[in-house]
A protein has these predicted regions:
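Nucleotide-sugar donor-binding/catalytic module of glycosyltransferases
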Residues: 1-122
Length: 122
């Protein structure tokens, strides 16, 4: 079994850095489970990797990965491209600029999936 409960795949494509930061802060606030934050860049015109890596460190996100697709492939294929880098037992896609509801959102998803033998969901 994976040691990481859930991977959040944060999809980005030419978003403002402030939008990406909003989402990253929302993930960093999570408690009650282990998570990986995986930023999946769909070949934005400018890479945000250095800034995202620095912010992840500042926020205390220890399990952080940034992957950049070599060409723009749209959201679904961007997520599919990121999946091999995911370490979590479960996956939660999140669009840049979106935030999780509260600090226990990921823990609630993990608990629900485990309690109900969920293998896939949206």
């Amino acid at each position: 079994m994976s040691q990481t409960d859930i991977t959040v795949i944060l999809t980005v494509y030419n978003q403002r850095p402030e939008s990406i930061e909003t989402s990253m802060r929302s993930v960093a606030a999570q408690t009650g489970c282990t998570y990986q934050l995986l930023v999946a860049d769909d070949h934005s015109s400018e890479s945000f990797e250095d800034e995202a890596t620095a912010l992840a460190s500042e926020l205390g996100i220890s399990n952080f990965t940034y992957v950049r697709h070599p060409e723009n492939v749209q959201t679904v294929r961007n997520i599919l491209h990121a999946l091999p880098y995911a370490e979590g037992q479960f996956i939660k896609p999140l669009g840049a600029g979106d935030a999780l509801y509260d600090e226990s959102t990921l823990a609630a998803i993990v608990a629900f999936c485990r309690d109900n033998d969920v293998h896939a969901g949206f």
